[in-house]
Amino acid sequence: MEKSKFRFKIPQYIRWIGWVLLVQFLLINISAAFYAYKLTHVYDDPKLRTAQSSKNIFEKTWRLFTGPRQPRSVITERPTFPYDTVNLKTRKGIDIEAWYSKTDSASRGTVILFHGITANKGMLLNEAYEFRYLGYNVMLVDFRAHGNSGGQTTTIGIRESEEVKMAYDYAIEKGEKNIFLWGSSMGAVVVAKAIDDYELKPSGVMLEMPFGSLQSHLQARARALGFQGFPEKPFGFFVTWWMGIEKGFNGFKHQTSLYAKKVNCPVLMQWGALDNYVLKSETDKIYNGIASTNKKLVVYDRAGHESLLLNDPVKWRIEAERFLSANSK
């Protein structure tokens, strides 16, 4: 008599659970791929800037699943001080526009300013006015896919370090030896990355509200989109992963604290205690990772993710003037 073979039969409900989890995993990845594309592309359609939220439940669900389209930031304000428009070009032929202005008094150096994601150089004019008042030439730069620069794609700070290098080289070619780099949000991250990538030697850097990593930045974007709490973590992970696949880089290595290890020049780092985009843990990790011993962290108790100058003008001016005076050559 032949022995009957024992067969383990998976219960029907477990198979259904398995299929449900598989479908959910596929849908999460499809949605993450859409978001990865949308968050790295800008569109010139002016209707996007005034678009109203659809009341159609199907349209709202589809938009939530695929992510919103981002309009290109438009420059609405120009300097009232004399300036030259500078046109630079990346290695891949992307046009980069900047404004360069000499101070009215004897120059004490040059401050190059870099904006955050979805912003542009026109939004940095308040800071530029302050630096000029302190006796510094200023250069304001539009990153690729922002303002008047070319390109439709941003890498959220990974490849934008080339723009910092080009602006720094431009100031060197003008004969400047006392160069400070100032950046806000993504601009601060890119400044740190450029020092790491190109071994730049500025007289000092001013970093305002840099995010900790691409993944933490995407978690913040998730919070802004309504995915608060637990969902923001898988959102950050999967969108980071898909950005890397779509753009050809390892997004998980995009960490400001790693770049900070190569920052040996004087550093003034500033952050708002009410910032919901950049958390205190990110700020502390970056600051503690900065290689320079000549560094200072200034916290604005009533500020969120915004212009720290406009939030507390007196405090900002005191800190900026002290830092520049102490570190100018």
Task: Explain the meaning of each model-derived region.
Residues 276-282:
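Conserved alpha/beta-hydrolase "acid-adjacent" motif
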Residues 14, 24-89:
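An N-terminal hydrophobic leader/cap segment in hydrolases
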Residues 131-150:
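Conserved alpha/beta-hydrolase
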Residues 123, 154-174:
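Alpha/beta-hydrolase active-site loop
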Residues 117-130:
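The serine-hydrolase catalytic nucleophile loop
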Residues 303-313:
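Catalytic histidine-centered segment of alpha/beta-hydrolase-like enzymes
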Residues 193-250, 259:
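Hydrolase active-site cap/lid region
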Residues 262-264, 269-271, 275:
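Short beta-strand/loop motif that positions the catalytic acidic residue
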